[in-house]
Amino acid sequence: MGSISPQKPPHAILVPYPAQGHVNPLMQLGKLLHARGFYITFVNTEHNHRRLIRSRGQEFIDGLPDFKFEAIPDGLPYTDRDATQHVPSLSDSTRKHCLAPFIDLIAKLKASPDVPPITCIISDGVMAFAIDAARHFGILEIQFWTTSACGFMAYLHHIELVRRGIVPFKDESFLHDGTLDQPVDFIPGMPNMKLRDMPSFIRVTDVNDIMFDFLGSEAHKSLKADAIILNTFDELEQEVLDAIAARYSKNIYTVGPFILLEKGIPEIKSKAFRSSLWKEDLSCLEWLDKREPDSVVYVNYGCVTTITNEQLNEFAWGLANSKHPFLWIVRPDVVMGESAVLPEEFYEEIKDRGLLVSWVPQDRVLQHPAVGVFLSHCGWNSTIECISGGKPMICWPFFAEQQTNCKYACDVWKTGVELSTNLKREELVSIIKEMMETEIGRERRRRAVEWRKKAEEAISVGGVSYNNFDTFIKEVILQQQTQ
């Protein structure tokens, strides 16, 4: 790889979408680049900047001499602490309001004698306004799609669904009349798909729906970037990656899983950076240490999934009645519009085998030998961490491309099983027992371990992702710096 001078380090500006599952992988990328000698400016929205101060402390935001944090407004009400939990409002607001303040920030950084010249901007794939800002200043712009490759490809086909007259649906009867079982046979590299396996944002009766329009347009706009990087590895999604390269762009770099690549970072100060927007409860790790290998059901719905109180109780009694130990993440805002309340008899039932906490260091949990299965919403961050940990999945997708990831986990990678949307406790008991006690579960676990080994091979020295990351730095970023 090309050498980097400490006197003239390349300067990368990183811009995540303001949600936990997007901030995490951008932070991992920032640490990887910082370890290679880059100066990093990490740009949060003001709302998330304040959340990081609450969860990590002011000293975290102060950063390091060569790893700095900045903030831009997202256009949402300053007084609403949970504003970024409503994804349509957040997406619409970032698209409309972030470009101008981001341009101002770049101008400020360019004028500052205290920071190196800007080499590149690496923005989240759904923060594509950064492409316009980069073009304004003549700066290299790289899009980081934090989805799976199959999720990215599905978003690129929103416009094709409209062209074929599939979307919009005439009314909401499509949700229950079998329409979602219609095959989708026109996406290259993604065979055996049905409409229900497509990202949930296609389920609209109006093509002007905020999220349908937002994801489709952001995906296509990202093709204008100088390069695209994905937190995946070739063998996991080879067919769809080949199709993306053939049809859209060859400047796509698979450089994951970051969670494993990050382990190779030398012991520098930025390696300890964690970007959780909630305070992480570390007591869960001691609790896991006392459990038998592969004995614990780990449950986490991600950072924005919300459920009803009725669903909360079905999950609670399903976990309790399975009789297996479980670690259950119950965010303070997980129940729509109210606090999560469970009956005293539930806590009495699970006191010796269940632990409920509000947030955990998930990467460490999924690497823990006590965890036997992960009940997940199938967000890509969680899915790739699960693959990296060699854990099978119980899939309960909520929205976005989680449905697509679920399809691949269950039918392609064969590491998962899917729960019904309208979950009942009896089904959860049955699925947990299947995954923890039967040959079906043992086979899913064997497959998960195989995928973990393949992921480790990809990021090892000489592996495909390792080499792709080197090539990305040398031929995309450093080549630009020397021009």
Swiss-Prot record:
GO terms for biological process: defense response. UDP-alpha-D-glucose binds at residues 146, 360, 362, 377, 380-382, 385, 401-402. Gene3D superfamilies: Glycogen Phosphorylase B. One of its GO terms (molecular function) is linamarin synthase activity. Its EC number is 2.4.1.63. It holds the Pfam family UDPGT. InterPro entries: UDP_glucos_trans (IPR002213). The active site is at 22 (proton acceptor), 124 (charge relay). An anthocyanidin binds at residues 22, 400. The keyword Transferase applies. Keywords: Glycosyltransferase, Plant defense, Transferase. Expressed in the cortex, xylem and phloem parenchyma, and in specific cells in the endodermis of the petiole of the first unfolded leaf. PANTHER family: GLUCOSYL/GLUCURONOSYL TRANSFERASES, GLYCOSYLTRANSFERASE. UDP-glucosyltransferase catalyzing in planta synthesis of cyanogenic glucosides. Able to glucosylate acetone cyanohydrin and 2-hydroxy-2-methylbutyronitrile, forming linamarin and lotaustralin. Also accepts, to some extent, a wide range of potential acceptor substrates, including simple alcohols, flavonoids, isoflavonoids and other hydroxynitriles such as p-hydroxymandelonitrile, mandelonitrile, (E)-4-hydroxy-2-methylbut-2-enenitrile and (E)- 2-(hydroxymethyl)but-2-enenitrile. Belongs to the UDP-glycosyltransferase family. This is Linamarin synthase 1. It comes from Manihot esculenta.
